[in-house]
Amino acid sequence: RRENIQHLIGHPRFELIRHDIVHPIYLEVDQIYNMACPASPPAYQYNAIKTIKTSTVGMVNILGLAKRCKARVLQASTSEVYGDPEIHPQTEDYWGHVNPIGPRSCYDEGKRAAECLMMDYHRQNGVDVKIVRIFNTYGPRMALDDGRVISNFIKQALKGEGLTIYGQGSQT
């Protein structure tokens, strides 16, 4: 949201560019931080096709731009690339246990494909890529109705309700 960065507007070293990464963009950059995908299940399931296109077609466009400009790319990925893991905790070399056709697959598989594209661009074209797999983000502007575990816990606690833990409580 624009109000989250309002304090940066007008700074000489900051420029806000509103652009859908599914469409190529032509500009000069030296770093790209890709966080362009909804992470809340209701948000990414609302338009599943748009979600997977953002992760895949968007990543092709980002990597093409990075290759042309020799820019570094940081991808905000997700713990969802592990799916419903059989190993706890997961290490980076764990490939995951993912349902490729389930209702969440637009997000999970989109992020997995984006990581694949990044590594292929790195190996084939020397693009400098970094991937961070983020688990359970939270912060002062998070929506309490976004359907993720931290927001659900906070909402239940504020209402004085017990916290709902699904499964055995060993999930990471």
Report the location of each language-model feature.
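Substrate-binding strand-loop-helix patch
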Residues: 140-147, 169-172
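Nucleotide-binding/hydrolysis machinery
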Residues: 164
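A glycine/serine/threonine-rich, flexible loop-to-helix segment
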Residues: 88-89, 144-152
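Activation segment of eukaryotic-like protein kinases
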Residues: 152-158
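N-terminal Rossmann-like NAD(P)+-binding domain of SDR-like oxidoreductases, especially those catalyzing
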Residues: 1-137, 157, 167-168
